[in-house]
Amino acid sequence: MSDRCVLILLALVLSVVQVLGHLFQGPTKEVLERTYDVIIVGAGAGGGAAASRLSENPHVRVLLIEAGGSDFMNLNISVPGRASTLVRSQFDWNFTTVPQVGLDNRPIVYPRGFVLGGSTAINQMAFCRGTKDDYDRWAKVAGDEGWSWKKLVPFVRQLDRMTLPADRHNTTGEFDPSIHYNGTVPISVAGFPLTTDPRVINTTTQLPDQFPFNLDYNSGNTIGIGWTQTTIYNSHRVSSATSYLAEAWNRTNLDIVVNTRVTKVLPLGYESGKPIMRGIEIAQSASGPTHTLQARKEVVLSAGSIKTPHILMLSGIGDAAYLTSKGVKPLVDLPSVGKNLHDHAFLGNSWLVNSNDTLDNLRRNATLAAEALAQWKVNGTGPLGLAGGSQLGWLRVPNASEFFAALGAEDPSAGPTSAHFEMITTDGFVSKRVSPPTQGHFFSFITAVISPTARGNVTLNSTDPFDAPIINPNLLGTEVDVAVMREAVKAARAFVAAPAWSDYILSEFGAFGEAHTDEELDAYIRNNTDTIDHPVGTVAMGKGAEGALDSELRVRGTIGLRVVDASAFPFIPSGHTQGPTYILAERAAALILGEM
């Protein structure tokens, strides 16, 4: 697809909501009376991609149901620099976790997308494919070489395409063009220069052993520091709605219904003792009417790592003893549903800097912020076209075998191409725990535990499908994860001690600057860590009883029911989860079409 074609596609998306005949704001009579081959629940990365690929076959009629609305081109969604405004907005499910033991018993806000595009419409837009070792571990756990990196390459090639950044600068040396293809999702490197950019890159030449430069972390080997690739095109956010679904808008065999929740999956009968789960129940409110729909071939749950297990448990699919205790009649005894929840822990670490030219100015100066928005509206340039950080680092702890052995643990990463922790650069103050200072200018490293060992769960709050489930990601729930975060903070300190920062860094800020011993660091970490918003694994594929799904993502013990979202991941990728969810959906669609 040429840049001109993408521009035309983007223009179409900007107006399509008002003219699309197959977008319904609720379950109309027309929808309820139609027959669909596949019904997909949830329009995020998994559901949006699967709906698009399945509807490429004109003989397959697809219904895509989204609980949220259709305003996926809202200004706050479209402007990358406004991503933080989307948390606790009308585009967020507004979940909150239970108190996290590993975070000093603090509950935390748990954002999930509630709009066409799902969490791809509210995330920080980092695009990562994952690593060779990540997928090879999936293949081993699932007992299916189809999930290996080598076998997934055809699906990776269908996924992304590199485009020019907003400022059209020369991107030579910022990514490897030979590993990017003509895929559906346009991505780019940062389109607005920051004064810290050369300092970050220079550090990789000054401290190459500890912080090697990585030309392109999407090669399958993430280790090193490199330029962030983001789902941004022409300075606009790219979501599954503006990419995959945009390609499918005019297909007569795809209907999309928004503002509608799937409350449970229904059995239509039995075959060989297994329930045929091709029915769904839908409603728009807790007090409103319910309706039922049936799929001829399959129901696909793509509601995400929180809502997919929630729907399954409400449908009687889960741990039978637990469901009985909650007043739900068990249909399929599948104890692993809702378990294995894991996530990447997030910690903002900030330094005062010798500069008055940082992104802190946008937060404090309303006039400057208005000027930046006006500039973005005119030509897409300026600081509001930036996502979370212009560079990413993926690193392993030194002497990993000895490090984890001393903790009485095995190396939790998938292998040498996969990181233990991540470092994200930000030209300004960052914290999910501390309010931004009213004075001073900052540089921050976000550190993240990228191969966590802690596991949590999703459980029922009640049998009312409009009640949020109980969410426990168990962040920093093991001493291993705390130790890895401690190493990440130490690495961030070592990074800014390089000569490249000697005239820039002034001092560490706040509680960060008061934490020196390991004990002090651990206390600082527990009191300031949050989530990076990557929940996975709650309906994971795997061999035997340990897997809720088989290797082709079918729910065990059922017929006609599949899961296509990050809940299917047996292990979290050592990277951000948007890209791997798209990859999973690409293969899932091929598997489904192969059975049509």
Q: Language-model features: where?
A:
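N-terminal redox-cofactor-binding region of secreted/periplasmic oxidoreductases
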Residues: 2-596
